[in-house]
């Protein structure tokens, strides 16, 4: 009688191993020209038929990141069922704009209106889709929201680079740099119920896209009361200074507390010099409403970052404070301000060095730019480098504010000057048994005694120790202290 071989026991893998096998099987670099194109491969859904375990893993990866445009939003409720909401970690909202006009010409009024209408209907469709979601519907930590625009011509960016495509891309970038997508009816967004499942917001992640107005961003943010991290991009704030008043009003509508708020102009890279011009007379306000709105909102923050936008000392303290209405920042721990050398009203915070050579002596940049692209030319514009008297008042206002910030651990105030040539930086840092203040500049700036006395009061009030003061001309002094304190 033949002896039967014993049946082999099935191989049972740990769930973590199965997860990793499935993950790397269904993910790859989709576009070889782009290192950031890691994603789900075409046809990955067929693996769901292997077993129930595989089906659950495939579904989890499918709904972890939703890419929604207007067409998909209209069908999303039928696909993203109530049970699947818990699988969603990120939503990438794509405002798919109509085909643009010729890249050789500026955006027309008709084209701008079409784009604005598309933003309006996309935001409204998103509100209708997300408003029913509750915090208990989604995973712990909520859902991150990323918002960008796209146009049908975006596909060309994945093609092999040729001299012709490079020239076309340069023209397209300049055309997009002069465009801004705005809501046609912001009040309609305000009428929707709040979205409670979104805990983080970020938009305008690519310089190649047509950018969404910071006002539209804030209108949407005002409907996201669970958001703890938010990034507001005021694209080319100097060029689009006309929206400053509307942006101030939109920020004032954000009533809830946020852990971390960042407001920046993504068209600039910190440290790069850019020729700034005074704002047009039509956009100048006697009262800096934007700085006041940010100041009011910052009293509900833990961390505030501002990069490359024009502000005034109203950001820190009202010019005519009332004893009964003194601002107080109970929870603010960190503030980082990288500010332009010119205020909203056209006042220069830094003056040109009379001994420095004029920028007109430099070789002009021949980038084939056209007259309509909105980028100012440097020509013979002097570059500011020496702190104006207004900077003493600026630091005094900052000290007044710091006295009202009992939780403050760090404040950085850094001027956007010519990288590697000029610098002007301030840094305040405190911990349980130590408090430091550093001023470092290329022009030999020294704070006056009133400023120093006011800053010495800050740690005495909050942690009852004396302030260590350092005045330097070392460009890297601030970074060295950062490393020393491991910030």
Predicted regions and their residues:
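Long, low-complexity intrinsically disordered regions enriched in Ser/Thr, Asp/Glu, Pro/Gly
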Residues: 2-3, 7-18, 23-30, 81, ...
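Generic preference for well-ordered alpha-helical elements
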Residues: 14-19, 37-51, 116-123, 213-217, ...
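The substrate-binding groove and active-site-proximal loops of carbohydrate-active enzymes
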Residues: 64, 111-117, 380-389
């Amino acid at each position: 009688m033949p002896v039967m071989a014993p049946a082999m026991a099935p191989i049972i893998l740990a769930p973590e191993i199965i997860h990793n096998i499935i993950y790397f099987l269904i993910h790859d670099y989709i576009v070889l020209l782009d290192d950031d194109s890691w994603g789900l491969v075409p046809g990955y859904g067929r693996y769901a038929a292997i077993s129930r375990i595989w089906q659950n893993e495939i579904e989890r990866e499918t709904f972890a990141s939703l890419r929604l445009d207007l067409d998909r939003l209209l069908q999303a409720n039928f696909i993203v069922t109530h049970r699947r909401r818990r699988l969603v970690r990120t939503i990438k909202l794509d405002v798919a704009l109509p085909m643009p006009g010729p890249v050789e010409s500026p955006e027309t009024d008709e084209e701008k209106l079409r784009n604005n209408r598309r933003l309006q209907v996309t935001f409204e469709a998103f509100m209708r889709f997300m408003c029913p979601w509750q915090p208990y519907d989604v995973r712990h930590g909520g859902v991150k929201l990323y918002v960008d625009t796209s146009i049908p011509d975006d596909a060309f960016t994945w093609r092999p680079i040729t001299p012709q495509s490079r020239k076309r891309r340069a023209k397209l970038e300049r055309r997009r740099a002069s465009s801004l997508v705005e809501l046609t009816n912001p009040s309609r967004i305000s009428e929707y119920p709040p979205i409670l499942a979104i805990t983080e917001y970020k938009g305008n992640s690519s310089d190649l896209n047509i950018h969404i107005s910071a006002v539209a961003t804030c209108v949407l943010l005002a409907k996201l009361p669970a958001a703890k991290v938010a990034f507001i991009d005021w694209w080319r704030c100097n060029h689009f200074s006309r929206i400053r008043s509307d942006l101030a009003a939109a920020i004032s509508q954000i009533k809830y507390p946020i852990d971390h708020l960042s407001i920046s102009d993504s068209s600039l890279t910190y440290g790069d010099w850019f020729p700034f011009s005074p704002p047009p007379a039509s956009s100048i306000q006697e009262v800096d409403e934007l700085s006041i709105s940010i100041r009011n909102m910052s009293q509900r923050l833990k961390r505030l970052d501002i990069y490359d936008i024009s502000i005034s000392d109203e950001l820190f303290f009202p010019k005519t404070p009332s004893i009964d209405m003194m601002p107080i920042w109970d929870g603010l721990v960190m503030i980082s301000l990288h500010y332009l050398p010119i205020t909203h009203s056209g006042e220069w915070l830094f003056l040109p060095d009379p001994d420095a050579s004029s920028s007109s002596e430099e070789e002009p940049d021949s980038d084939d730019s056209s007259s309509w692209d909105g980028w100012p030319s440097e020509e013979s514009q002097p570059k500011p480098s020496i702190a104006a008297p207004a900077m003493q008042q600026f630091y005094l206002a900052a000290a007044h504010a710091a006295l009202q910030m009992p939780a403050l651990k760090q404040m950085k105030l850094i001027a956007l000057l010519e990288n590697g040539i000029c610098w002007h930086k301030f840094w305040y840092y405190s911990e349980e048994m130590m408090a430091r203040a550093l001023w470092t500049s290329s022009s030999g700036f020294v704070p006056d005694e009133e400023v120093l006395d006011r800053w010495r009061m800050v740690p005495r009030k909050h942690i009852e120790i004396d302030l260590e003061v350092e005045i330097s001309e070392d460009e890297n002094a601030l970074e060295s202290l950062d490393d020393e304190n491991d910030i």
